[in-house]
Amino acid sequence: MTQESYGVYSFVSDSADFGDMYKYVIYTKSGERFEHCDPYGFGMELRPQWASYIVDLSEYKFTDDKWMECRNKNYNSPMNIYEVHLGSWLNNPQNENGWYNYSEIADKLIQYAKKHKYTHLEFLPLSEHPADCSWGYQNTGFFSPTSRYGTAAQLMELVDKCHKNNIGVIMDFVPVHFAVDGYGLAQYDGSYLYEYPPSDVGISEWGTCNFNHSRNETRCLVQSAANFWLEKFHFDGLRMDAISRAIYWGGDPARGVNENTVSFLKNMNLGLQKLHPTAMLI
């Protein structure tokens, strides 16, 4: 790879194609060698594998123009929100893990939501994550829809179908912490690039790395990911997870306010509202 004048490394391949897998190999200053996924990649292998792969985000063509033009934040309207974990909502006997893909489950979910008068579906995090038991709250691929349930195009189809049936779609988003798995963000270049150095605020109560929101690398990644899901997948809102743990040091009000994180959250919200004025930020 070539190091650009502003510090970013780049590589151009004329032979690269959609579906091709890749990893980053990083050599630290001390000479250690690590392999990582692409935290900005649009697709990752099904766990326990973790290579990133090239995705064509223009493959699916949305047909929800009318919905997107007319939607609003619903702050002054009654909402009936159904929270869904896609992996356990309905068992698929034809799949060894019991999962339906995004396309297969769409009509089943929509039928259920309409029957019970739900106005919105709220999905537990759909970004890629290594552990099923985390329900998606410990991320490694912040721009990658989890491959457990199919492809990016299939997720777009699910959202599109919901909109055609006048059902809004919200996704849980995790801006506070990330998975400790070695191929992810943790000590990405051999230093504490996205997280805190070892301290009593470095590891969360869930055993994950807390984001250090004072660093520009972290701010860029998290706010870009939030914008990505709203822009590319037409989600109608994001529910920010574990915000109390971000506002206060260690989630403890007695320890005071984490001003860096509060500043980040304010700036991210302002930016998202400018770009997506009708999206809900919860």
Could you tell me what each predicted segment is?
Residues 67-76, 85-235, 239-257:
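Substrate-binding/active-site clefts of carbohydrate-active enzymes
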Residues 22, 140, 279:
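Residue-level detector of short, conserved catalytic/binding motifs and their immediate flanks
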Residues 46-48, 234-236, 248-282:
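Conserved alpha/beta catalytic core and glycan-binding cleft of carbohydrate-active enzymes
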Residues 4-82, 88-97, 104:
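The feature marks proteins involved in alpha-glucan
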Residues 8, 106-108, 267-268:
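Short alpha-helical segments and helix-capping/turn motifs at coil-helix boundaries
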